[in-house]
């Protein structure tokens, strides 16, 4: 069977519903999480509402907004969304509800960027900002070494209590995500 025949044979499955335990998705098309750099204080904006809602209305079955930071220093930049504070629940709930209203299933990717954080937005060079910059902070990670050539800031190595703090922050962010719907 040629590759084209295989694609044609498999394509219909892409548009069929899929159920995993109690979650049913109308098709197998997913919107992966993409950092949009449009949040303020970790809160999702009307931009997120428009983007995610239009994708859900357009037929995507599973919609991930963007990586959702669990702590302020776990963001890529100051303009990234988060759920480290109850004040962020309302804005994300609006986005989640619209995704559902449009027939899609909302999903979430919680994250902490660690030593790769404190960055400028991509259209400003995507280089790291030092802690003394108004939009920068001290990056933390599992080792004191920067993550690759593009990342140049000194890294504060996480202590065991700090690792436990991040673990608790994941749990707290997950509870907030559940409250969002």
Explain the meaning of each model-derived region:
Residues 181:
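Active-site-proximal glycine-rich helix-loop-beta segment
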Residues 97, 105, 111-178:
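Non-globular sequence segments
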Residues 2-113, 120-122, 166:
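N-terminal capping/small domains of soluble enzymes
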């Amino acid at each position: 069977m040629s590759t084209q025949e295989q694609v044609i044979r498999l394509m219909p499955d892409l548009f069929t519903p899929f159920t995993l335990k109690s979650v049913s998705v109308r098709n197998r098309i997913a919107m992966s999480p993409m950092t949009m750099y449009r949040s303020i204080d970790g809160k999702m904006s009307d931009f997120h509402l428009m983007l995610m809602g239009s994708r859900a209305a357009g037929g995507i079955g599973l919609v991930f907004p963007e990586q959702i930071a669990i702590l302020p220093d776990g963001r890529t930049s100051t303009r990234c969304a988060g759920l480290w504070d109850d004040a962020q629940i309302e804005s994300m709930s609006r986005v989640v509800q619209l995704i559902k209203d449009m027939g899609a299933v909302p999903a979430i990717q919680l994250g902490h960027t660690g030593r790769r954080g404190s960055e400028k937005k991509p259209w400003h060079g995507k280089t790291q900002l030092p802690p003394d910059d108004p939009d920068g902070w001290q990056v933390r990670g599992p080792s004191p070494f920067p993550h690759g050539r593009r990342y140049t800031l000194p890294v504060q190595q996480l202590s065991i209590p700090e690792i436990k703090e991040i673990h608790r922050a994941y749990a707290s962010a997950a509870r907030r995500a559940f409250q969002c719907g």
